[in-house]
Amino acid sequence: METGGGGDGTGDICCLSYNQDCTSVAIGMRSGYKLYSLSNVERLDLVHESCEAKDVYIVERLFSSSLVVVVSHAKPRQMNVLHFKKGTEICNYNYSDNILSIRLNRQRLIVCLEESIYIHNIKDMKLLKTLLDTPRNPHGLCTLSINHSNSYLAYPGSSSTGEVSLYDANCLKCECTIPAHDSPLAAIAFNSTGTKLASASEKGTVIRVFSIPDGQKLYEFRRGMKRYVNISSLVFSMDSQFLCASSNTETVHVFKLEQLPERSEENASWTGYMGKMFMAASNYLPTQVSDMMNQDRAFATVRLNFSGQKNACTLVTIQKLPRLLVTSSSGHLYVYNLDPQDGGECVLIKKHSLLGSAKSETDGDSDAESPVPVSYAATVARPSSAPALSTITGYSEDGGTLRGEVIPEHELAVGPVCLDDEKEFPPVSIKNP
């Protein structure tokens, strides 16, 4: 999920993004890009670093595989699909306008331009569908469910209101339109199963959650009332119990998605009677007042020591404990503990630097180096003899990659793979149709 793209980063950082299951973080820089593993609180493992492309403003990794998609300011209309372990380019593709965002899961790769969206089959990069004349979308706002069994795509259905268009990228058909907000959309996100969609408008005061694919409103949360903010990051926890939102302010909000009570036909208790009276009375109030009475507040918060910087947040489980991570455009990763029972103020337990050496800080103190067992990330990060990128020229919209490689099936699998086994990388050539 890319949350800091668009090329308007601060200093050396051009973009920030987590992979689909938030097990790694990617940063695009003036000098190239880096991938870090998020498997340990105490230290960051550098999975890969590349200086081949400069001014990288989009970098997306496919889960924990070796596949990464990169777009640079030098060629903003060209998408490059790379296999960083082998040091090769699988394919590249050029579009009619600048690429604003890219989303991918194990079935589909989505390329979003300002007024069109391209849907590719990720296994062979064949272009399956082009959504033309979509509402003007200057920030490339869109999201793709990571559950490949449904592959729902959501994008703005209007440039003037907060309408969400829901598209089935597997069956290549429109599902529904959700009137989510009165103001234009600022952020949208699916949960891990693709059964819920969260949205926020440019005002940034109210966050709503809808059921998918029917588009029924399930929850409504109020981030604040005093001021409008620019929400830059919106993400569910993997178990869909929490929803996290960060903005250009110093506060990150975590909302708890309480299990919705089943509506019984009859409830003769005093509380049930009062509840019915309350709901009946709210129907006579102005709509804005009635909505506010039914909105929930944040379950937990984080007070950042900065504001005004672009940042990306996520909720993960690291070393069996729930954590809230915030990556800032200044090049730092902040790790907080989240109390899943009581919520409240989250506690900062670690601060990592994403630029230069992978030093970590806790309350201003640097950690001493300690031996670390060899992991997948450490293995991938080992330097190799300067691999030259193989340039693959040409691409057919009907036939996919030309003289390139089909993306290996195991890169799309759920389980672990043997990345060093050459038998798992049979060179498959695709001929012209």
Swiss-Prot record:
Domain statement: The N-terminus might form a beta-propeller domain involved in specific binding to phosphatidylinositol 3,5-bisphosphate (PIP2), leading to the association of the protein to the membrane. Association to the membrane can also occur through binding to phosphatidylinositol 3-monophosphate (PI3P). The L/FRRG motif is required for recruitment to PtdIns3P.
InterPro entries reported in the protein's UniProt record: PROPPIN (IPR048720), WD40/YVTN_repeat-like_dom_sf (IPR015943), WD40_repeat_dom_sf (IPR036322), WD40_rpt (IPR001680)
Lineage: Eukaryota, Metazoa, Chordata, Craniata, Vertebrata
Family, similarity comment: Belongs to the WD repeat PROPPIN family.
Sequence ranges of the WD repeats: 136-177, 180-220, 226-265, 296-346
Compartments where located: Golgi apparatus, trans-Golgi network; Endosome; Cytoplasmic vesicle, Clathrin-coated vesicle; Preautophagosomal structure membrane
Gene name per UniProt: wipi1
Transferase is among the record's keywords: no
Recorded topology in the membrane: Peripheral membrane protein
Keyword tags: Autophagy, Cytoplasm, Cytoplasmic vesicle, Cytoskeleton, Endosome, Golgi apparatus, Lipid-binding, Membrane, Repeat, WD repeat
Superkingdom to which the source organism belongs: Eukaryota
Span of the annotated motif L/FRRG motif: 221-224
Motif mapping: Nuclear receptor interaction: 127-132
Listed GO MF terms: phosphatidylinositol-3,5-bisphosphate binding; phosphatidylinositol-3-phosphate binding; protein-macromolecule adaptor activity
Organism: Xenopus laevis (African clawed frog)
Name by which UniProt lists this protein: WD repeat domain phosphoinositide-interacting protein 1
Cytoplasm is among the record's keywords: yes
Cellular component terms per the entry's GO annotation: clathrin-coated vesicle; cytoskeleton; cytosol; endosome; Golgi apparatus; phagophore assembly site; phagophore assembly site membrane
Gene Ontology BP, a term: autophagosome assembly
Task of the protein: Component of the autophagy machinery that controls the major intracellular degradation process by which cytoplasmic materials are packaged into autophagosomes and delivered to lysosomes for degradation. Plays an important role in starvation- and calcium-mediated autophagy, as well as in mitophagy. Functions downstream of the ulk1 and PI3-kinases that produce phosphatidylinositol 3-phosphate (PtdIns3P) on membranes of the endoplasmic reticulum once activated.
Main location: Golgi
